[in-house]
Amino acid sequence: MSEPAILVLADGSVFHGTSIGAKGHTVGEVVFNTAMTGYQEILTDPSYFRQIVTLTYPHIGNTGTNLEDCEANHVYASGLIIRDLPLLHSNFRSSMSLRDYLQTHNVVAIADIDTRRLTRILRDKGAQAGCIMTGEIDEAKALELAKSFGSMAGKDLAQEVSTGEIFTWTSGQWQLGKGFIEQTQAEFNVVAYDFGVKHNILRMLAERGCKITVVPAKTSAEQVLALNPDGIFLSNGPGDPEPCDYAISAIQTLLASKKPIFGICLGHQLLGLAAGGKTKKMAFGHHGANHPVQDLNTQKVFITSQNHGFEVDEASLPSHVRVTHRSLFDNSVQGIELSDQSAFSFQGHPEASPGPNDVAYLFDKFINEMRKANLSQLSTYVAHH
C-alpha cells in the first residue's frame, strides 16, 4: 500500500503525493533539473548536498539503478521529487529499482505531484526551501521546517562533503565488458582539491595520463606545492563559494606559484574570487543537461551539463581576468581565464555525467597547459646548465 507524502515550500505552497523513499522528513533548497536521464548520477552528485531535486522529465526510474553510475560513494541530495515512478524498470545493468535504491540509501522522496506547477513556481519565484514529509503528515510542521532552513547564501558546504584525508585516484572511465579501467601509466602529477568532487572528473583526468592526489578542501597551498604537482585542479561542490575563505586564500598563493590551474563549477567560482572578482546567488540556478554555451574564442556553441546556484559577477572581474564562455540562456559567465598565467575555469560540467561531452576538450586544454609548463621548465634548466 502506498504511503502519503507532502511537499511544502517556504512560501506556503503544498503538494500532495506518494512516498517512494525512506520514511520521515527532509528539508533543503528545492531546485529543478531538466535532464531526461541520469537520475542516479544526479542523486550522488555532492553538488546537490542540502538540496531537494525536482526532475522535470515525467517518467523517472525506467532503467532502475546500477553499481556503476555513481558520482560519489553515497547519495548527497537531500530529497527527490518526481512526477511518475514506473511500475517496471528494465536495463541489462540494473541491479535495483529506483524505489529500493532510495529506501536503501535513506532518501526521502515524493512522486505523483504536479512537477510542472512546482517548476513554474521555482522559475517565477526562485529556488526556495522546502520540506518533504511522509507518513504522519503535519502541514504546519512541514511549513515551519521549510522556513527554518533559510537560504543557501552564506552556507559553506564544501568542507562538509570534502574527503577527510588525502588519497590517490587511478581509475579511468567505465567501458562495456571491462568496467572501470585502471590507469597504470601517468605523465602528469595533479593535485585535486575536493570541494565535493564528482568521480567522473577524476576518471577523465586519469584517462588523460594524470596521477591524481585528492586533498581535503582545507589543505594549505604549502602542502599542495610540497607534493610537487604539474597542475592543480579545483573541483565542483555545493553551497556558497564566498564563505570558503580558506580555499580562496590557498588559491591566491597557488596562483603566485604559476602552476597550471583548472577549476570546474565551485572551483570556477573560487578561482574568480581568488583573482579579485565577486560571486552572486542566482534566482533558480542552472540545473540540466541541455544548456547552450558559447566559446568566445571560437564562437562555437556547445551543449553542456550544468549544476550551480551561484555565478561569477562579470562586472566585478579585474582587467587581467577574461571571460571565455557565456551562457546563451541568460548571458551569465561560463568560463574565465587569467591573462597573465595558465589558470582557467568553466562553470558547467565538462565531464557531464549526466549530459553531453561537448566541452570535454577543456580537460585536454589542461593537459596541454601542463605539458607546456613542463617543457618551459626543462628549457630553462637546460639553458642554465
UniProtKB/Swiss-Prot annotation:
This protein's record includes keyword ATP-binding: yes
Catalytic activity: hydrogencarbonate + L-glutamine + 2 ATP + H2O = carbamoyl phosphate + L-glutamate + 2 ADP + phosphate + 2 H(+)
InterPro entries: Anth_synth/Amidotransfase, CarbamoylP_synth_ssu, CarbamoylP_synth_ssu_N, CarbP_synth_ssu_N_sf, Class_I_gatase-like, CPSase_GATase1, GATASE
Keywords from the UniProt entry: Amino-acid biosynthesis, Arginine biosynthesis, ATP-binding, Glutamine amidotransferase, Ligase, Nucleotide-binding, Pyrimidine biosynthesis
Binding site for L-glutamine: S47, G237, G239, L266, Q269, N307, G309, F310
Keyword Transcription regulation listed: no
Entry EC no(s): 6.3.5.5
Region (CPSase): 1-185
Highest taxon of the lineage: Bacteria
One MF annotation (Gene Ontology) recorded for this entry: ATP binding
Coiled coil regions, renumbered to chain: none
Pathway stated in the Swiss-Prot or TrEMBL entry: Amino-acid biosynthesis; L-arginine biosynthesis; carbamoyl phosphate from bicarbonate: step 1/1; Pyrimidine metabolism; UMP biosynthesis via de novo pathway; (S)-dihydroorotate from bicarbonate: step 1/3
Assembly with partners or alone: Composed of two chains; the small (or glutamine) chain promotes the hydrolysis of glutamine to ammonia, which is used by the large (or ammonia) chain to synthesize carbamoyl phosphate. Tetramer of heterodimers (alpha,beta)4.
Function (record text): Small subunit of the glutamine-dependent carbamoyl phosphate synthetase (CPSase). CPSase catalyzes the formation of carbamoyl phosphate from the ammonia moiety of glutamine, carbonate, and phosphate donated by ATP, constituting the first step of 2 biosynthetic pathways, one leading to arginine and/or urea and the other to pyrimidine nucleotides. The small subunit (glutamine amidotransferase) binds and cleaves glutamine to supply the large subunit with the substrate ammonia.
Sequence similarity: Belongs to the CarA family.
Protein name: Carbamoyl phosphate synthase small chain
Origin species: Pasteurella multocida (strain Pm70)
